[in-house]
């Protein structure tokens, strides 16, 4: 397949028939349907991606590095690319899934922009970070074991320049059981409205609940501040999905 040929995009039917339960993995089968899966599963995703371009344009610094950690197929990476006006910036996408990186390479090649993109098939917990003005963790931290999240965010905070930012998008949980029930029900209705059956919703939930560990907004705010960020604000929320902007002042 030529790098100028778009990868085949399929409708997500991975959980449409009964299957033995196993943990969710970002393998080749998921990579093939990922654009459809995330659009139909994550409310607000199609708003968050173009706003990452806007945020990048506001906070990117000349000669700095920009990172998309857990880049999957590169939607955030390309949004950042189009928000960077400086040709001396370095843009890096990192993902530990070979299937995702392989497909991401095609999307990067098809994108009409001159800024080079470096893709690394690496663990974000150990990938090299430095001189960062904009970093994104777009629905990625939730898949990192909770006991390793502070260390990762501290590494990002240490690598971030004064005036730099982290965009952190996450599925969250709520302190109140009543609110949790309402937000979960609304999220499931969103997925039904996008064509998922009750079987698909329940089977995906069973597959993902052991690997996607959501936390409260208070948990995220506290950890980001401990990691070296001075301001943390929620710039977007739809049901139990949020995107935060963490700013390092000094």
UniProtKB/Swiss-Prot annotation:
Keywords on record: S-adenosyl-L-methionine, Transferase
Transmembrane segments: none
Catalyzed chemical reaction(s): prephenate + S-adenosyl-L-methionine = carboxy-S-adenosyl-L-methionine + 3-phenylpyruvate + H2O
Enzyme type, top EC level: transferase
Pfam family, one: Methyltransf_25
GO molecular function, one term: carboxyl- or carbamoyltransferase activity
Binding-site positions, S-adenosyl-L-methionine: 45, 70-72, 95-96, 123-124, 138, 205
Transferase is among the record's keywords: yes
GO biological process, one term: tRNA wobble uridine modification
CDD domains for this protein: AdoMet_MTases
Family statement drawn from the similarity comment of this UniProt entry: Belongs to the class I-like SAM-binding methyltransferase superfamily. Cx-SAM synthase family.
Subunit relationships: Homodimer.
Protein name: Carboxy-S-adenosyl-L-methionine synthase
Gene source species: Marinobacter nauticus (strain ATCC 700491 / DSM 11845 / VT8) (Marinobacter aquaeolei)
Gene name per UniProt: cmoA
């Amino acid at each position: 397949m030529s790098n100028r040929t778009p990868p085949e995009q399929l409708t997500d039917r991975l959980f449409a028939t009964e299957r033995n339960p196993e943990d969710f993995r970002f393998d080749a089968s998921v990579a093939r349907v990922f654009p459809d899966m995330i659009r139909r599963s994550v409310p607000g995703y199609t708003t968050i991606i173009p706003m990452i371009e806007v945020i990048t344009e506001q906070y990117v610094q000349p000669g700095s590095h920009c990172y998309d950690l857990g880049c999957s197929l590169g939607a955030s990476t390309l949004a950042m690319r189009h928000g960077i006006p400086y040709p001396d910036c370095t843009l890096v996408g990192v993902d530990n899934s070979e299937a995702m990186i392989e497909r991401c390479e095609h999307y990067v090649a098809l994108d009409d922009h001159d800024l080079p993109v470096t893709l690394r098939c690496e663990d974000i917990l150990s990938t090299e970070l430095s001189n960062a003005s904009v970093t994104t963790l777009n629905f990625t931290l939730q898949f990192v074991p909770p006991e390793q999240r502070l260390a990762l965010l501290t590494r990002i905070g240490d690598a971030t320049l004064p005036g730099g930012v982290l965009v952190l998008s996450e599925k969250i949980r709520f302190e109140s059981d009543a609110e949790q029930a309402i937000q979960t029900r609304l999220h499931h209705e969103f997925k039904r409205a996008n064509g998922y059956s009750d079987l698909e919703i329940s089977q995906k939930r069973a597959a993902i609940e052991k690997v996607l560990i959501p936390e409260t907004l208070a948990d995220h705010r506290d950890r980001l501040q401990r990691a070296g960020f001075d301001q943390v604000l929620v710039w977007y929320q739809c049901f139990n999905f949020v995107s935060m902007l963490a700013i390092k002042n000094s």
